[in-house]
């Protein structure tokens, strides 16, 4: 079960969190999650953290974050790279290990500094005798480029939209609602249960407290988004406004055996249910969250109508629209407090963020079923059922 969790505010690309590494952010989230759970670091038996952009991050980013968070040196850690699925897969793996009897208490989550992703110089080890050399953007190539079709994932999504036929207006309206819902959630204090402020040192004077997601624009409307140019094709429908933001952040949860939590007298947010993992038939993204949700709820033994809370990562508006339609659910149940279009999408973090948010939303409601799902690079999808 998920006992508690915490996340940093999400920073924009080269924004307020640009000077924090992924491991710095991960440590902040882990430390805060332990505090919220009222669990001492000495009780943690294993740490699993997702991170996608690891070039230049140093060995074992998960272990770096764990040690920086005060978790003892004799506690092992595992770094996961399953692209956008990394954070949710970390939680699912933690659940599986606990069910297998390997551990009782695991920290799981995801961390990412997209701002600090370096540029790479391929073939530099063998040297360049003459002429120019080309730098490769680690962020773009290893984070946002579909290797199977050799194009940006946005272009791939645009290509699939020729089949799905979601209009520019539909995507702009969805994106605007994401911002409006997220802004309203912040105003109503919804995110206060999950976000821990980050103290940012200044050259002079006291540190600044960075406390709210940086990318949310409360005044965003479909009309204002209509003025943006297509991002991936001249006649395309996807813009920077209907795609998730490139961002920095981290999230962590405390996953614990139920008997252990009861022994310690702890409350919990939600029990972890079935996990759905899907892939194919190609590298497109739109159907993957829906496919993963269908697999997970079938394993859980429930129907889609029994889901009270549905979190679908907004990699693109087209993905959330397609998966919502394929599930046949009321759109009002999906991403009730906004999503990655407004909040941002630090790729290693997002799976953990939406799982934590779904658990907290379920706890606020008192009972029911929730599911968190994402698409992932290479045409994969993960979903995790939560119940209370």
Curated annotation (Swiss-Prot):
Gene3D superfamilies: 3.40.47.10. GO terms for molecular function: acetyl-CoA C-acetyltransferase activity. Keywords: Acyltransferase, Isopeptide bond, Transferase, Ubl conjugation. It catalyses: 2 acetyl-CoA = acetoacetyl-CoA + CoA. PROSITE patterns: THIOLASE_1, THIOLASE_2, THIOLASE_3. The active site is at residues 84, 345, 375. There is a cross-link at residue 187 (Isoglutamyl lysine isopeptide (Lys-Gln) (interchain with Q-Cter in protein Pup)). Its EC number is 2.3.1.9. It is an enzyme of class 2 (transferase). It comes from the Bacteria. CDD domains: thiolase. Belongs to the thiolase-like superfamily. Thiolase family. This is Probable acetyl-CoA acetyltransferase. It comes from Mycolicibacterium smegmatis (strain ATCC 700084 / mc(2)155) (Mycobacterium smegmatis).
